[in-house]
Regions:
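N-terminal export signals
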Residues: 1-2, 6-27
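Copper-binding active sites and cupredoxin-like electron-transfer domains
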Residues: 2, 71-79, 141, 159-162
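N-terminal post-signal-peptidase region of extra-cytosolic proteins
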Residues: 43-53
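Beta-strand cores of secreted/periplasmic/IMS beta-sandwich domains, seen most often
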Residues: 51-74, 95-102, 106-109
Length: 162
């Protein structure tokens, strides 16, 4: 998927909003929604997607996976987690809340649709400990170009924070 100006503004706005919150508001943990969809809302040709497929959060925030379409779930990639983080696997067709306290980058996928490239990335706090390593993890089938695109947008997002 090509990154549009609208995508850049969305990423920038989400990042700015999370950093401008008073520390007390962040301490309670914000909720970030990720929809599990059969079709990308802006490109119906793009099938089996998490939307958004990259999320920037603070430690203690919750990522809420919404089963907007049936037959999807969220599962951690064990080889794409920060040290000390716990893996997860949600039930297919169910909403799922994931609260993240360990800083770093988290790769995940939809169990039935991994081969379709239904993958995503969560960036929690300081990701310098494992972000670059995650880029080198071997990807297969349609997951490879999707993760390449996600990491390109992640690079842009992180560069904007520097």
């Amino acid at each position: 998927m090509k990154l549009t100006g609208r995508d850049h503004l969305t990423l920038l706005g989400a990042t700015a909003a999370s950093t401008l919150l008073p520390s007390g508001a962040r301490a309670n943990g914000a909720v970030h929604e990720v929809k599990m969809l059969n079709h990308h809302p802006d490109d119906k040709k793009e099938l089996m997607v998490f939307y958004p497929d990259i999320v920037r959060v603070s430690p203690g925030d919750t990522v809420r996976f919404l089963a907007a379409d049936n037959n999807h779930n969220s599962q951690a990639r064990n080889d794409m987690l920060p040290e000390g983080a716990e893996a997860w696997k949600s039930k297919i067709g169910s909403d799922f809340d994931l609260t993240l306290d360990v800083e770093g980058a988290y790769g995940y996928f939809c169990t039935p649709h991994k081969s379709y490239g239904m993958v995503g990335l969560i960036l929690v706090g300081d990701v310098s400990g494992n972000y670059e390593t995650l880029k080198t993890v071997r990807q297969r089938s349609k997951s490879k170009p999707r993760f390449e695109d996600i990491f390109a947008r992640g690079d842009w997002l992180l560069a904007g924070e520097a």
